[in-house]
Amino acid sequence: MEIADILKAVTVDCKDNRREFTVRNRIEVIESMLSNSSYQLVGRGKLCLIYAKKPIDNKKVVLISSHIDCVYDRLFCEEQENGILCGTFDNSLTNSCLLYDMLTDKLDDNVVVAFTGDEEEDSNGAKEVMRMLRRQHIQIAFCFVLDVTEEGWKEKCPYTIENDLGVDMETGYEIIRAAKEWGQRYVFVHDAEPDESWDYDEEDIPCLTLCYPIYGDMHSNEGCLTRKNSLPIYSEAIARFTKVATNAVI
């Protein structure tokens, strides 16, 4: 399955009331896609799904956190001319690229994946993930938050690096070096809009946000625009930088 096909499949409704999911369409798609994969659901909270490979080989992990809640009244994904996609993509864009990496086994065994709710309000999904992993005595050595952004669109970047919080000098250096050696265009925004990274940082977890650039109002029912050819590059960015972090901190 191509990433664009996954994107169309996961651009469906998912809502919560800050305490639990109330609309679960996207959850059902994710669970179905991963049912025959190398991943198992190791944690199900009221506002999160936590996946890991079978079994979790290390009590020290790199976490990827991608929120699945949305604010739209209607959801859609359409392909326009010149390789432009239009749709309600906050946050199905990063969900789809992450799922592709999981389905094609591009992530290391000690990478744990969390799909979270309530990001649009209080990030209670991310907070629940931290509580659940802590109860299992699993240490989050580094966290990558995935989200969409208005940064980097004019520069035609397929990804951005934002909100680096609590990242030690050596790990940060290795990530930026990997980005430069890769050669894909990107922008770095140290102090960006608030997202789940702020909540992980409050628990002293080193983190950054890896964002997918879009154009337009990301919360509009009319949708926003993004470049289709960025899908495989963003997907590769997730796999590439999580591997760098794993080598640096585990």
Where are these regions (language model features)?
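A non-catalytic alpha/beta surface segment that caps or lines the substrate-entry region
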Residues: 8-58
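Generic non-transmembrane alpha-helical segments
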Residues: 9, 32-33, 174-183, 236-248
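Short secondary-structure junctions
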Residues: 36-44, 79, 181-189
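Conserved beta-strand scaffold positions in the cores of enzyme catalytic domains, especially
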Residues: 41, 113, 143, 207-209
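Catalytic-core environment of secreted peptidases
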Residues: 49-93
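Acidic/histidine-rich catalytic neighborhood of metal-dependent amide-processing enzymes
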Residues: 71-73, 85-170, 176, 184-199
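His/Asp/Glu-rich mid-to-C-terminal helical/loop segments that flank catalytic regions of hydrolases
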Residues: 103-104, 215-250
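Functional cleft and adjacent loop/helix regions within the main domain
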Residues: 189-232
